[in-house]
Amino acid sequence: MTQDYRVLLYYQYVPIEDGESFAQKHLSDCKALGLKGRILVADEGINGTVSGTVEQTNAYMSLMKNDSRFTSTIFKIDEAKQNAFKKMHVRYRPELVNLSLEDDVNPLELTGAYLDPKEFREAMLDENTVVIDARNDYEFDLGHFRGAIRPEIRSFRELPQWIRDNKEQFMEKRVLTYCTGGIRCEKFSGWLVREGFKDVGQLHGGIATYGKDPEVQGDLWYGQMYVFDSRIAVPINQKEHVIVGRDWFDGSPCERYINCGNPECNRQMLASKENEAKYLGACSHECRVHPDNRYIKAHQLSNQEVQERLALLEKDLAS
């Protein structure tokens, strides 16, 4: 059955003169088409995820292709049951992805070797290869390639320092890296080359492309792919589904992400509906008793109900 909506994921490193003005006009164009989504514009290019009807997304792709700067842009297309976003944002930023480098990497001049899904899969099976996930830790925890290294980072900009601290582990190995759609790896793989890594490859088109390849069919991917829209999780492996996510509270298999109820914390964590209720939607006791706990407010729990749940939880944890 054909779905009514689509989600488009894309990026393009290309010089954009006066990116701020471009972003303002692009927002107007997107709103005129009725699209929803989030697009970042920088002088170095564009990176976006938008959703809308088939007609709206087709019109957007035509709009982009009619601009000489974006004729080679590759759109990764997912069918969807509804819009993946509630609003339309186009924002200007100094750079598309932030590695916090004093001397930034220009992917148009320096980047790792592009590997298509089949080449990437074959390279992963080589015992002299290490695979580094270029995403954040919470993305990795939902799903990742078999044997991939999980950098202990909360954001992409922390990755270079983590590599410097751990480079002896894989300096002499062939290094592969991957991310959701490919944009982060363009810069990260180029930085690895600049740092002296001899053999660096990147998954061209990212995990999103790997999962749609008719031959590879997402093989060697465990879990689901984290996405930055209302879907949160997208299946990748067409051959088998292995759950790698673990519930924050009890370690059981889980693929349901929530944010900690304490708005000052907002930690993303995997949790079942049952555990979310049991732990009042919060990652710790301090967050559970926070006066602005969103879970308590959303469920209109009385102070008595909160105290009863806390008492039961304390008893359970003590046993």
Curated annotation (Swiss-Prot):
Alphabetized UniProt keyword annotations: Oxidoreductase, tRNA processing
> A GO term (biological process) for this protein?
tRNA modification
Please report the stretch or stretches of sequence annotated as the Rhodanese domain: 125-219
Please report a single Pfam family linked to this protein: Rhodanese_C
Q: What does this protein do?
A: Catalyzes oxygen-dependent 5-hydroxyuridine (ho5U) modification at position 34 in tRNAs.
Q: Which reaction does it catalyse?
A: uridine(34) in tRNA + AH2 + O2 = 5-hydroxyuridine(34) in tRNA + A + H2O
Q: Where is the active site?
A: 179 (cysteine persulfide intermediate)
Similarity section:
Belongs to the TrhO family.
Coiled-coil spans are none
Q: What is the official name of this protein in its record? A: tRNA uridine(34) hydroxylase
Species of provenance: Lactococcus lactis subsp. cremoris (strain SK11)
Q: Name one GO molecular function term.
A: oxidoreductase activity, acting on paired donors, with incorporation or reduction of molecular oxygen
* CDD domains the record matches: RHOD_YceA
Matches recorded under NCBIfam families: PRK00142.1-3
Gene3D superfamilies per record: 3.30.70.100, Rhodanese-like domain (3.40.250.10)
* Source organism phylogeny: Bacteria, Bacillati, Bacillota, Bacilli, Lactobacillales
EC code:
1.14.-.-
